Amino acid sequence: MRELTKDDVLAAVKGGSVFASGGGGWVDHGLEIGGAALAVGKPKLVSVDELPDDAIILTCTAIGAPAGRDWQMLGKDYIKAVQLIIEKYEGKIVGVMTPQNGMSSTINGWLPAAALGLVVVDATGDIRAHPTGKMGSLGLSSNIEYETIQAVAGGKPEIGSYLELIVKGTVARTSNILRTASDMAGGFIAAARHPLPAKYIKEHAAIGGISIAIDLGRAIIEAEPFGPAHVLETITEKTGGRIIGTGKVRKKDVHYSGAFDIGTIEIESEENTYILHVMNEYMAVEDRGGKRYSTFPDVITTFSIETGQPVSVGNIEEGAEIAVFAIDKAKIPLSSSVKDPSVYPEVEEVLGIELYKYAFEEKKEINV
């Protein structure tokens, strides 16, 4: 167990931005929420092995489309979502975890943990960011015997979009309800969900996910004074990732629908045109001939050639010079969530491409 610091906040945002895979929130939001956590308390990071098997851990997150522009999530909303669970749940909540890393989502839970006297557990529902709550639900999405409890809070009271909601039921049904609530609240909403014992977390989460992001962030911070090329080299070396290709953004065709950013981004190089399939995050990379280069749950990230910084889907602009980067799933801890075949059809239908087949059924990943 150790106390999280201001340096950890910056490192978590920097490293989390790589694992964000084009989504995972916003840098400014992550810094703000992390700073608020340190202002109201002393959040502590603990290994799941430090907790008794029956200690109850809650997942803290935010639900929505990162490119949305009419949402509002304040620090109090993250706290309120956890409080709603605490009020209704019969057991005692001991700690919080995040379902994913990201520009701000690595820091999910730090503020309510600091405010409510909980610990931050060093585990993630997925090492990278993903579009649906089911993909970070620790393999529970297809379990109809598990009754979860989920709560959300957020929106703009001045325009009547503020919502608080608490629901019980299966993971699949309740997750769909909260996605609708997010849309009604302006496109993003703070959430808390899935109280689970530490024993289950140990068996099903991506253990050490927070520390992995923080360690990468520290390496990035050390590399930044030496320029963007050195930053990209450092990230590649630290993660075992690879640059799939570099080029100019030829076309961005991404639209908002049902609290998701959906579409494609085309990166044109001298040798090839890469198509990035987007559902909030980058879910696959292929070329016009259909050759697949990377598929979720690989980490897929776009970097600015000019700055060496990750660029989110919402901030990608046509004409920008971009590097397409990937970390093969074999080089990251995988949770039960991303191995669960039931979480893929919804996303595959929206994108119009296959994911699970490429990720787990066939050896089709191309190392370049």
Q: For each of these PLM feature ranges, what is it?
A:
Residues 51-67, 135-180:
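A structural-propensity feature for long, helix-poor, extended segments
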Residues 114-134:
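Short, acidic/small-residue loops that bind anionic groups at enzyme active sites
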Residues 213-269:
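Oxyanion-binding "anion nests"
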Residues 150-219:
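Phosphate/diphosphate-binding glycine-rich loops and adjacent basic-rich segments that engage nucleotide
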Residues 26-30, 78-79, 99-110, 127-131:
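Short glycine/serine/threonine-rich phosphate/pyrophosphate-binding segments
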